[in-house]
């Protein structure tokens, strides 16, 4: 048993995560095993409940989704402002914001200040995330920093069009104008332009969504990830 304790392997979910660990903690033995997604649960071709109807969206609405903690890291105020800006150019833009956090009240106040109460629907965290993702047209992750967002991977598995910021983990999985659109940090006006681009170029929404879904199927299948973790354990115990 003593030999087991002498061997260490730190599992990191992204290459940027591993590099940060090396710089911050001096990690000597580390390996990257990316997060896994349950592709049976997050399958865009299965049946879903009609959350668009529950939240009051019509078939004509183009719904932008935000799913995550409502904290400074996730830049919810940028998201709210981006929706207001996009609606100045196309009234079909609506939004669904799902999450909780220490900026909840500030975010709701921003929604009121922009006059978006009827156009940005909010909800606390929900257990039916696949249904939430099915209900939206575009998934937005405007984070200021990020490791590797599980919510992003789930949206990719659901074949969603993506608008993201270039955080370290995100850049490892999203290629600009191939599997999503990447905009700079703190630029709600650029987020807005991306929503409108997807609305006016539906082929981008479809093509980028397919590419994102393929990335998940190839790299982030939970069964594949479980096998990789098991192999690490076996190597340590040998």
Residue ranges and their predicted role:
Residues 1-5:
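Short, small-residue-biased leader/transition segments that mark boundaries at the very start
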Residues 7-32, 37-41:
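A short, active-site helix/loop in glycosyltransferases that binds the activated sugar's phosphate group
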Residues 53, 190, 197, 204-219, ...:
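A short, well-ordered alpha-helix in the C-terminal region of glycosyltransferases
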Residues 62, 66-88, 95, 102-108, ...:
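A conserved mid-protein helix/loop that constitutes part of the nucleotide-sugar donor-binding site
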Residues 108-124:
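Nucleotide-activated donor-binding/catalytic signature segment of Leloir-type glycosyltransferases, i.e.
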Residues 125, 144:
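Aromatic "clamp/platform" in nucleotide-sugar-dependent glycosyltransferases that forms part
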Residues 161-164, 174:
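Short hydrophobic beta-strand element within catalytic cores of glycosyltransferases
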Residues 176-177, 181-188, 197-202:
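Conserved acidic donor-binding segment of nucleotide-sugar-dependent glycosyltransferases
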């Amino acid at each position: 048993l003593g030999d087991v304790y002498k061997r260490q392997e730190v599992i990191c979910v992204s290459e940027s995560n591993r590099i940060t660990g090396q710089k911050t903690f001096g990690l000597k033995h580390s390996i990257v095993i990316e997060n896994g997604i349950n592709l049976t649960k997050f399958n865009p071709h299965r049946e879903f409940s009609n959350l668009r109807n529950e939240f009051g969206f019509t078939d004509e609405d183009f719904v932008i989704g935000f799913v995550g903690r409502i904290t400074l890291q996730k830049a919810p105020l940028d998201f709210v402002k981006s929706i207001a800006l996009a609606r100045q150019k196309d009234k079909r833009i609506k939004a669904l914001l799902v999450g909780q956090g220490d900026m909840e009240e500030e975010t709701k106040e921003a929604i009121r200040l922009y006059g978006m109460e009827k156009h940005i629907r909010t909800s606390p965290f929900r257990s039916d995330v696949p249904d939430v993702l099915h209900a939206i047209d575009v998934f937005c992750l405007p984070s200021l920093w990020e490791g590797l967002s599980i919510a992003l991977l789930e949206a990719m598995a659901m074949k969603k069009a993506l608008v993201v910021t270039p955080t370290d983990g995100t850049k490892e999985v999203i290629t600009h104008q191939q599997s999503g659109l990447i905009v700079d940090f703190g630029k709600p006006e650029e987020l807005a332009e991306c929503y409108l681009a997807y609305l006016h170029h539906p082929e981008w929404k479809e093509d980028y969504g397919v590419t994102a879904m393929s990335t998940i199927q190839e790299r982030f299948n939970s069964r594949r990830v479980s096998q990789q973790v098991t192999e690490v354990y076996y190597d340590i115990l040998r």
